[in-house]
Amino acid sequence: PPPASWLTLRERHPNVDDYLTGPTLEQSALARLRAHDEDGLQQLLGDFHTWVTAHTVPRPSDAQQHPFLPVGTDEVLPGECIDAGFDNLVPDGTDLRLVDDEWWAEGGVDPDMATVRALWKLAWVTVESGTRHPWPATTSISQLTLILCGLYPRPLGPNPLERLYAAE
């Protein structure tokens, strides 16, 4: 039967052979932040951008609008990418692999919205964990999100936080 909502939680039973060793992209980003390594952080943001670009596809003709798929979105990330944050991506030697795909957004996800959400989640864990970073210790989650958006390899559109908060 079709899902009752645009967002569904799918039950997963991963095989232990599917687990990857090594740090998540988030762990690597936090290490770069602690080291005040902005160049290294920008490299990780570039790796994330490359992953997003590689997984972006044309919007399905039957995809219905939802908070993370606004009208006018021509390209999408697949539905399992709704939670594709730095905490859910692990390098596998040649690429980044999404290791937590239990959430599904029907019709896909706007790539910019998914990216802003991922950057907000990284800012949140940075601030909430007290991780040192190159900016003032009083930097808020919102401020750090905007800093990360500014370091991202390409513009993410106007008012990224307002769009994210409206979607959430």
Which residues does each predicted region cover?
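Intrinsically disordered or highly flexible coil/loop and linker segments, enriched in small
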Residues: 57-61, 90, 154-157
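Conserved ATP-binding subdomain of kinase catalytic cores across diverse folds
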Residues: 1-65
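Intrinsic-disorder-associated interaction segments
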Residues: 18, 22, 34-37, 41, ...
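Catalytic activation segment of kinase domains across protein kinase-like and atypical kinase folds
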Residues: 67-133
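Helical subdomain adjoining the active site within ATP-dependent kinase catalytic cores
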Residues: 122-168
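Short glycine-rich, low-complexity/disordered patches
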Residues: 43-77, 82, 130-143
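Intrinsically disordered, low-complexity segments enriched in charged and polar residues
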Residues: 39, 43, 66, 82, ...
